[in-house]
């Protein structure tokens, strides 16, 4: 049995919160970057060694249809929801051989790259930045991110759309933090260690993740339940709960050489697919 604890999930997420995906963060301004071109592609190789990413509550309904959403807890940040990408350390099973996203829904954390909005400056304004090491920067086939209009340098529609997305994502992350604080206040989280059994006898167990305790949820005081309902967070909760069974979908994409401990029972000769999550 391979015990895949999520200790490294936590470490990776702390690093991600510190923007380590962005190797060279460059604040954008109209003076220096008025001629900058950017070509956006669907190569997400920068996320290939990542097994979980932060996700906003508003994304739960779309993300839960395809893959698992869980919660993790680490000392400085508290509880946050994560989109599980792999069952082993440094593994993203949602990318194909060309580092394109395999599935319909791409998390906002991924979609925003190479842009990022950093903390407010001394004037209280958030600053839009870009990863200066992104391969698509200054590509001749790329689009200008600024344009001249009425004698002024202004964002192009491409950059405006990115800025709107960043503002919305940051706002949703703030709302999600309020949601997770409420879960902790209501004592609705419990730690789980789901076990995934493959038909060929390999087993994988995940530790260090949290889910909503449905038994406690059903016993919640009416006033608290109404707060969750009217805020829309009750829908988030049930989307999360439904998503946990999607760990099987991840297991079906494990490479054939992913090591596990075979069961002592005879091997199943059928197609090697995941058969259950205990």
Write out the residue ranges for each language-model feature.
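Detector for glycine-centered tight turns/loop "hinges" at secondary-structure junctions
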Residues: 76-77, 99, 201
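Short solvent-exposed loop/turn micro-motifs enriched in small/polar/acidic residues
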Residues: 62, 109, 187-190
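Aromatic- and glycine-enriched beta-alpha-beta binding-site module
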Residues: 80-148
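Short, extreme N-terminal leader segments that mark the start of a protein/domain
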Residues: 14-85
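N-terminal amphipathic/basic-hydrophobic helices that include classical n-h-c signal peptides
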Residues: 1-18
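A contiguous, surface-oriented mixed alpha/beta subdomain in the mid-to-C-terminal portion of proteins
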Residues: 117-278
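Short, basic/low-complexity N-terminal boundary segments at the transition from targeting/disordered tails
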Residues: 45-49, 88-99, 172-180
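Short, glycine-/Ser/Thr-/acidic-enriched flexible segments
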Residues: 75-76, 110, 211
């Amino acid at each position: 049995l391979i015990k895949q604890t999520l200790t490294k999930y936590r470490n990776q997420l702390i690093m991600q919160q510190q923007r380590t995906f962005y190797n060279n963060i460059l604040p954008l301004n109209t003076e220096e970057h008025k001629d900058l071109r950017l070509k956006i592609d669907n190569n997400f190789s920068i996320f290939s060694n990542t097994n979980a990413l932060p996700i906003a509550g508003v994304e739960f309904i779309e993300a839960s249809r395809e893959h698992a959403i869980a919660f993790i807890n680490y000392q400085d940040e508290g509880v946050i929801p994560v989109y599980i990408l792999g069952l082993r350390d440094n593994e993203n099973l949602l990318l194909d051989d060309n580092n394109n996203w395999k599935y319909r829904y791409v998390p906002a954390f991924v979609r925003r790259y190479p842009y990022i909005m950093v903390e407010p400056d001394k004037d209280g304004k958030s600053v839009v930045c870009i990863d200066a090491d992104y391969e698509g920067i200054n590509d001749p086939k790329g689009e200008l991110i600024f344009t001249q209009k009425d004698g002024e340098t202004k964002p192009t529609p491409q950059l405006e759309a990115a800025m709107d997305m960043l503002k919305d994502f940051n706002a949703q992350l703030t709302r999600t933090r309020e949601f997770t604080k409420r879960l902790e206040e209501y004592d609705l989280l419990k730690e789980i260690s789901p076990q995934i059994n493959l038909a060929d006898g390999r087993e994988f167990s995940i530790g260090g993740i949290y889910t909503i305790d449905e038994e406690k949820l059903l016993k919640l005081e009416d006033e608290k339940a109404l707060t969750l309902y009217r805020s829309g967070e009750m829908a988030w909760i049930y989307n999360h709960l439904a998503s946990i069974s999607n760990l099987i979908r991840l297991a079906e994409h494990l490479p054939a050489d992913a090591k596990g401990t075979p069961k002592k029972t005879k091997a199943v000769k059928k197609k090697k697919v995941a058969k259950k999550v205990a």
